[in-house]
Amino acid sequence: MLDCRAVIMLWLLPWVTQGLAVPRSSSPDWAQCQQLSRNLCMLAWNAHAPAGHMNLLREEEDEETKNNVPRIQCEDGCDPQGLKDNSQFCLQRIRQGLAFYKHLLDSDIFKGEPALLPDSPMEQLHTSLLGLSQLLQPEDHPRETQQMPSLSSSQQWQRPLLRSKILRSLQAFLAIAARVFAHGAATLTEPLVPTA
């Protein structure tokens, strides 16, 4: 009869032969998240081409607007020690942010634009946002429901300004998320090391 260690080693054999890290039930594939978030950053920058004077326009945000926009903050546990202790708080905040921006990209603000044609930077951004969101969704949890911003119908003249503001905010959010995933990929992915 096989002892317990032999059974565990047989169970881990497929990952050892492929040189993969042993999957954890609560942790994402940090390397894949790093790659997707890096790709998302590039897509967000490509989707928001500078438009001269529009970049100089700074709209003052009221308190309600500031509170609705997801931001990764210190208390979210996205710092190196917070990720090491329990990455779920940080990953939940990133999932919420991705869902928020996906909701905005699905709104009438971005509808009917030539930039949303298949294979356009905006469509690729939308698809990649969805891909990273799905990768971060815990397998044992159904899709989380969260409060989405209530969007009133925008006027045609408002859309370029709103698009620019949303994409700038998304760029900032994705830059921080990419740093989180880069740290996670470098330090939290533990390769399988056989014990003697």
UniProtKB/Swiss-Prot annotation:
Q: Which residues form the signal peptide?
A: 1-21
| Gene ablation phenotype (knockout) | Mice have no overt phenotype but display compromised humoral and delayed-type hypersensitivity responses. They also have impaired secretion of IL17 and IL17F, higher susceptibility to Klebsiella pneumoniae and Citrobacter rodentium infection, do not develop experimentally-induced autoimmune encephalitis a mouse model of multiple sclerosis, collagen-induced arthritis a rodent model of rheumatoid arthritis and also spontaneous colitis induced by IL10 deficiency a rodent model of inflammatory bowel disease.
What do the Gene Ontology cellular component annotations say? extracellular region; extracellular space; interleukin-23 complex
Instruction: Name where it's found.
Output: Secreted
Give GO BP annotations, semicolon-separated.
cell surface receptor signaling pathway via JAK-STAT; defense response to Gram-negative bacterium; defense response to virus; inflammatory response; innate immune response; negative regulation of interleukin-10 production; positive regulation of activated T cell proliferation; positive regulation of defense response to virus by host
Q: Does the keyword Phosphoprotein apply?
A: no
Keywords noted in UniProt? Antiviral defense, Cytokine, Disulfide bond, Immunity, Inflammatory response, Innate immunity, Secreted, Signal, Tissue remodeling
Q: What is the stated purpose of this protein?
A: Associates with IL12B to form the IL-23 interleukin, a heterodimeric cytokine which functions in innate and adaptive immunity. IL-23 may constitute with IL-17 an acute response to infection in peripheral tissues. IL-23 binds to a heterodimeric receptor complex composed of IL12RB1 and IL23R, activates the Jak-Stat signaling cascade, stimulates memory rather than naive T-cells and promotes production of pro-inflammatory cytokines. IL-23 induces autoimmune inflammation and thus may be responsible for autoimmune inflammatory diseases and may be important for tumorigenesis.
What is the protein's given name? Interleukin-23 subunit alpha
